Regions:
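Hydrophobic, well-ordered secondary-structure segments
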Residues: 104, 143, 161-165
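Conserved, surface-exposed functional patches that form binding/active-site neighborhoods
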Residues: 110-154
């Protein structure tokens, strides 16, 4: 499934932003804690000019905790990047994983090295099918992410096609 993703840094107090969403009718639908380990075979090639390339060649070991339930996954994200280096869409491949440490060890045997570890808390707000995720990232700050899945993209394309057919 292809997703359109927009992620921006929150430039105001988080509590103020969350209050604004609540006033607009958004409701908290879930919270989770995420511990991501990015691994790559391209670590030795990493420089300021090729970060997106190295990330595209990375796998992600993820431990997600939701409602005291742990979910462990191995993920590959195939990101589509524009000429400015912005991620404009991505397709994910997820596999369930019983043991993140063993998975990390397995990937190390085939020359994958840890690129970065990212830990964050997520609070997801929803209204009318629109979800906004506040991500409190350790040592980085708060980001807001919007993801539009393939179903919504198809619906938007259908609406555009209907508009065009009315004109023709």
């Amino acid at each position: 499934m292809k997703q359109i993703e927009i992620t921006v840094r929150l430039n105001e107090d988080k509590q103020t932003a969350m209050k604004k969403l609540s006033e607009l009718g958004y409701k908290v639908i879930r919270q989770s804690d995420v511990d991501d380990i990015y691994m790559t075979t391209k670590l030795d090639e990493l420089n300021a000019d090729n970060i997106q390339y190295v990330l595209k060649k990375s796998i992600l070991l993820r431990k997600l905790t939701v409602n005291n339930t742990e979910i462990k996954k191995i993920t590959y994200k195939n990101k589509e990047i524009d000429s400015n280096g912005n991620v404009i869409s991505e397709q994910k491949v997820n596999l369930n994983c019983e043991d993140i440490d063993k998975a990390k060890k397995l990937f190390s045997y085939v020359d994958f090295k840890e690129l970065v570890r990212v830990k964050y808390h997520v609070t997801v707000y929803e209204k009318d099918g629109i979800e906004l995720a506040f991500q409190d990232v350790e040592n980085l700050g708060t980001l807001i992410e919007y993801e539009n899945n393939d179903r919504v993209v198809k619906e938007e394309n259908k609406i555009e096609e209907e508009k065009v057919s009315k004109i023709l």
